[in-house]
């Protein structure tokens, strides 16, 4: 045995490394017994061991597993049994001790991943300290570990469209070299790809004035632009209307057809004879029924407060006339206009086809020229009764409804010397704010306000109390500071007005109406110098214009031309201009504020008459100045006064001044 061991000594398994420290504190690992190894050990050490010596494996000692012993007999070539897996030994697999195992050693900076089933870690996001003398951090078993060295590296881009590299993907460095830049930009689509072409056409807005592209210096409501590409017609959304709505619409259809026809009686009869009696009856009706345009609805102001009509106005029989009956009546009203933007519940599904057919004709008629004549069918949906109410532009506080608490900015462009001691006629005075302001501030000899709507005239007469109360309040403040009221002790005696709730005065108007002017009172002092009359200034025939006699020094025509133009067409507007010229005395002036043509289309669907006249208009507002100075009318000259800086751009309209010669030609 000794000889055999000596001969086979070079083939023995090398001795295991010295055992590591028992970090886990467990028992010994599995023991392996080998007779050949024991014999060779005796030759080296020279000591005698008993039969069956045991050799402890280094791996078992290091692991501390305390597993079962494995004995190998008759192993070929004297080799001992292979120890268990190194990973299993280090984890302490197969041992009976349940102590925490030692962490594995990192190899070349790589931490091997533990399978989720081994080791029995604690809950997530917790720090685990190994048992025994040496404490170490243990990563959670079921949490993915971040790799230090990734197995698969990310593929960096190598092909750049602009010819750059990873450090210069846009190839900006090529711009430093002019030759390279010129070569790259020789073919534009390659160096800078063109954007994808969209489905919708690009709308190019070309301004009318290239020096003012934003139309900041113009006074029109809308900038006149020309579209190089056609507009895209959007689809309108219509709410679903059930059968209940259709039944209700059919039930109310018969009543609306009869209620839409207005009476054909004259709006205002003549001022003498039977007309005076009829006018008194109308005044009584206005006192009884509440008026929607009244500023003070709780106080019934007597019409006798207003001074009587001047004799010059009573003497002229043809100064006031009624509008033609054809322009007052209109088509039956069944539903709202198709051009209205708001959703209305007064149109049923059966009208969808008619609405679509009329919309196309209206769009084509918007840009119709003056010299062309086309056939424009009427809207199939009809006109509403509410629209007939305001067909003459007789909105309450038409000019100042957007800024009711502010002063009329048109007063800033007017000059007081135009009105002092003059006879003034204000056409389309509405509720009379501008008329009363001029009569109160600048002292005209006579101020006549004329409007076609009797309800607006009724409100204008009631507004006299407000202006008179304001004047009385200012006079009271002035008298308080008068030095002539000093007493015996040298102190100023101030007579304070009785305290009264300001809210009642603001909501209910003045406490008392102004006094009725006595006989012989000065008629040139406010409020005796102002009077409001209901009537239509547009005459029926040209023969009546020739019979007009001069009566006034100043005629005001603010924001009126559009409504005369739409209701009576070119003939009615020309007739009104000629009558204004004949109504002025030699040396008189006309203050004109026309509306722009762009604002006409917004009101073309009010009535059937307006819709027809809109497409027949040939005399545009830009041609008013040339027409008024032509021999057909007779004004000698005109000038642009200014454009009031109104807060609303739609009311920023130019104000013109037309002069009548001292010796008129006719």
Curated annotation (Swiss-Prot):
Residues 1-141, 235-291, 309-383 are annotated as: Disordered. The modification Omega-N-methylarginine is found at residue 91. The modification Phosphoserine is found at residues 57, 126, 150, 154, 191-192, 229, 307, 321, 368. Pfam families: Bin3, Methyltransf_31. PROSITE patterns: BIN3_SAM. Signal peptide: none annotated. The modification Phosphothreonine is found at residues 188, 268. Residues 50-61, 245-254, 309-337 have a biased composition (Low complexity). There is a cross-link at residue 620 (Glycyl lysine isopeptide (Lys-Gly) (interchain with G-Cter in SUMO2)). Residues 235-244, 338-347 have a biased composition (Basic residues). It is an enzyme of class 2 (transferase). It is found in: Nucleus. PANTHER family: 7SK SNRNA METHYLPHOSPHATE CAPPING ENZYME, BICOID-INTERACTING PROTEIN RELATED. This is 7SK snRNA methylphosphate capping enzyme.
């Amino acid at each position: 045995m000794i000889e055999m061991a000596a001969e086979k000594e070079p083939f023995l398994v090398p001795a295991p490394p010295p055992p590591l420290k028992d970090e886990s504190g467990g028992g010994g690992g599995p023991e392996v017994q080998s007779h050949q190894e024991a014999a060779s050990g005796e030759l080296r050490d020279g000591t005698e061991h008993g039969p069956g010596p045991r050799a402890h494996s280094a791996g078992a000692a290091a692991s501390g597993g305390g597993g079962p012993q494995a004995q190998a007999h008759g192993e070929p070539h004297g080799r001992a049994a292979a120890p268990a897996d190194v990973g299993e030994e280090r984890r302490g697999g197969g041992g009976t001790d349940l102590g925490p195992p030692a962490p594995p050693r990192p190899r070349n900076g790589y931490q091997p991943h533990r399978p989720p089933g081994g080791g029995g870690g604690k809950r997530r996001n917790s720090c685990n300290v190994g048992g025994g003398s040496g404490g170490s951090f243990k990563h959670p078993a079921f949490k993915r570990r971040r790799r230090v060295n990734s197995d698969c590296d990310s593929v960096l881009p190598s092909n750049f469209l602009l010819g750059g590299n990873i450090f210069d993907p846009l190839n900006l460095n090529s711009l430093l070299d002019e030759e390279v830049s010129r070569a790259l930009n020789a073919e534009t689509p390659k160096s800078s790809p063109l954007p994808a072409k969209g489905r919708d056409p690009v709308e190019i807005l070309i301004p009318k004035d290239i020096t003012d592209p934003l139309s900041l210096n113009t006074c029109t409501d809308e900038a006149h632009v020309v579209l190089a590409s056609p507009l895209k017609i959007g689809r309108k959304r219509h709410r679903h209307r059930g059968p209940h709505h259709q039944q209700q619409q059919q039930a109310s259809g018969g009543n609306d057809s009869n209620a839409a026809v207005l009476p054909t009686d004259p709006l205002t009869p003549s001022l003498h004879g039977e007309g005076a009696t009829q006018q008194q009856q109308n005044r009584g009706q206005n006192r009884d029924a509440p008026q929607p345009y009244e500023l003070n609805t709780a106080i019934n102001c007597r019409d006798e407060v207003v001074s009587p009509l001047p004799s010059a106005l009573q003497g002229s029989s043809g100064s006031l006339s009624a509008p033609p009956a054809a322009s007052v009546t209109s088509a039956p009203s069944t539903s709202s206009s198709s051009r209205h933007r708001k959703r209305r519940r007064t149109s049923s599904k059966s009208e969808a086809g008619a609405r679509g057919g009329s919309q196309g004709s209206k769009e084509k008629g918007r840009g119709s020229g003056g010299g062309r004549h086309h056939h424009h069918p009427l809207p199939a949906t009809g006109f509403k009764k509410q629209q007939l109410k305001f067909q003459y532009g007789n909105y309450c506080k038409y000019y100042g409804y957007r800024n009711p608490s502010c002063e009329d900015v048109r007063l800033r462009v007017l000059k007081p010397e135009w009105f002092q001691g003059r006879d003034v006629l204000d056409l389309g005075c509405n509720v009379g704010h501008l008329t009363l302001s001029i009569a109160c501030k600048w002292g005209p000899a006579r101020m006549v306000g004329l409007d076609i709507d009797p309800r607006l005239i009724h409100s204008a007469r009631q507004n006299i109390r407000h202006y008179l109360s304001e004047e009385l309040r200012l006079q009271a403040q002035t008298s308080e500071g008068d030095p002539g009221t000093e007493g015996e002790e040298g102190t100023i005696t101030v007579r304070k007005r009785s305290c009264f709730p300001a809210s009642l005065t603001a909501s209910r108007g003045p406490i008392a109406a102004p006094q009725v002017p006595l006989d012989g009172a000065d008629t040139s002092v406010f409020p005796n110098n102002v009077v409001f009359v209901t009537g239509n200034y547009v005459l029926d025939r040209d023969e009546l214009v020739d019979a007009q006699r001069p009566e006034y020094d100043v005629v005001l025509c603010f924001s009126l031309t559009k409504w005369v133009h739409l209701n009576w067409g070119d003939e009615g507007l020309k007739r009104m201009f000629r009558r204004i010229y004949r109504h002025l005395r030699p040396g008189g002036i006309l203050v004109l504020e026309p509306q722009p043509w762009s604002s006409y289309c917004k009101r073309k669907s009010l009535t059937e008459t307006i819709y027809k006249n809109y497409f027949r208009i040939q005399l545009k507002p830009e041609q008013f100045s040339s027409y008024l100075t032509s021999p057909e009318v007779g004004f000698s000259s005109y000038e642009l006064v200014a454009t009031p800086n109104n807060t609303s751009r739609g009311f920023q309209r130019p104000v013109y001044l037309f002069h009548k010669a001292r010796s008129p030609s006719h």
